[in-house]
Amino acid sequence: GLAPLRSVINYVRDKRENYGTVQIIYGSRSKDDLVDYQEIINEWMADDGIEVNLTIDREQEGWDGHVGFVPNYVKELNPDITKTVVMCGPPIMIKFTLGGLKELGFNETQVFTTMELRMKCAIGKCGRCNIGNKYVCKDGPVFRFDQLSELPNEY
């Protein structure tokens, strides 16, 4: 979901002079799933220098925006490869979006993702979040793509 990225987006908004234009690509299964975030999405859309791109997985009555999966939409939008990418979402979306970003020319140190879905106790005791020699709760939950590529393919 969008919640883990809200603070970083707001930080960048507050320090816009250091970051330039921000491109947000937000996908959900249906337009109804966007309702929870509609207030903050509208706030970001009203902000000069923020480009908000919304997509839903399948056509739906009353939706006139983009329809399609996030990895494909990212390729269509062809984001600036000199920028940094921060993303979160279901593991399957992350996997295919990472592949698409690499195809577009992003290098492995420009892409950050979160793996908090694997956490349970969040203090390193239960071992549920262990991937290879890393504990998501202690070593993350945010990882660069190059760090992920060093881990076993469990995510």
Predicted regions and their residues:
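FNR/FR-type flavoprotein reductase catalytic core
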Residues: G1-K120
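Local cysteine-cluster metal-coordination motifs and their immediate loop/turn environment
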Residues: I92, E116-P141
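Short microdomains enriched in Cys/His and/or Lys/Arg
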Residues: F143-Y155
